[in-house]
């Protein structure tokens, strides 16, 4: 589950970066997940910056989880906080992509 979280986080922030680029957001070309998440929050693409920055931190430290208690804590975070944030981002990105596509026609 933790490995899937890491993969999903990577895909999520990179998808956010692409949609920000489509909308012409200045600064979207950076390679930094932190900057992309902060820009996404500033522009209203991300609802809860604290959750996303916590995800970034947990993604970076999850490779160093060595005991069952830490695994259990991470699973609870994923279930209770991170999955809802991914779902909300998916909805927002679909809407923003549709907006960008309608501008092309």
Regions found by a protein language model. Name each.
Residues 1-105:
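Solvent-exposed interaction patches of small proteins and small membrane subunits
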């Amino acid at each position: 589950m933790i490995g899937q979280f890491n993969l999903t986080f990577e895909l999520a922030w990179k998808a956010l970066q692409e949609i920000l680029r489509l909308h012409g957001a200045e600064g979207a070309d950076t390679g930094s997940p932190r900057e992309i998440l902060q820009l996404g929050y500033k522009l209203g693409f991300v609802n809860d910056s604290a959750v996303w920055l916590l995800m970034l931190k947990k993604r970076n430290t999850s490779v160093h989880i060595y005991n069952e208690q830490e695994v259990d804590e991470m699973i609870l975070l994923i279930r209770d906080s991170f999955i809802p944030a991914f779902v909300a981002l998916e909805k927002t990105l679909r809407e923003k992509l549709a907006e960008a596509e309608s501008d092309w026609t």
